[in-house]
Amino acid sequence: MALITERVPERWEQLEELVTAILHECGMMARRKVSLALPRGSVDVDVLAEETSDRIVQRIICECKNWRTNIPREVVHAFRTVMQETGAHRGYIISKVGFQPGAVEAARATNIELVTFIEFQNIYFDKWINNRILVART
C-alpha cells in the first residue's frame, strides 16, 4: 500500500491539515473549517474540497476523527444529514482507529466512505502522483 505521507497525526488539527494538503496536492481547491449554509442554518465542516472537471463541480466533505476509539453510528447519522443538506457528492469520515459495526451499517448504500487515514491516502494516491507529474511537466 502506497502512502502519500508517513506523518502520523497526533492531534485532530494535524489530521485536518494533512487531509486538506493531500486533496490540495491532488489538484482540488481544499479548505479547512468551512461554514456551509443549510436550509435551516449552517454547519461547520472539517474539510471541504471542490474539483471542477468540464465545468462540473464535485464537492467532497471530510469529517476527521482522530479519536482513540472506534467511531459510533451516531456520527455517521449526523454526517449523512450534512451530506444530504449540503448537496455534497462524496463524503469521508476519516478515523484514527476504525468504526463500530453500527457505523459501517449506517454508511452502507450512501455516498459516505468510512476510512482510516492510511486508507484515505491509498484512495487518493494515484490522483496525487498523477497531479505531481502533471505539475512537474508544466
Predicted regions and their residues:
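Mixed-charge (Asp/Glu-Lys/Arg
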Residues: 1-138
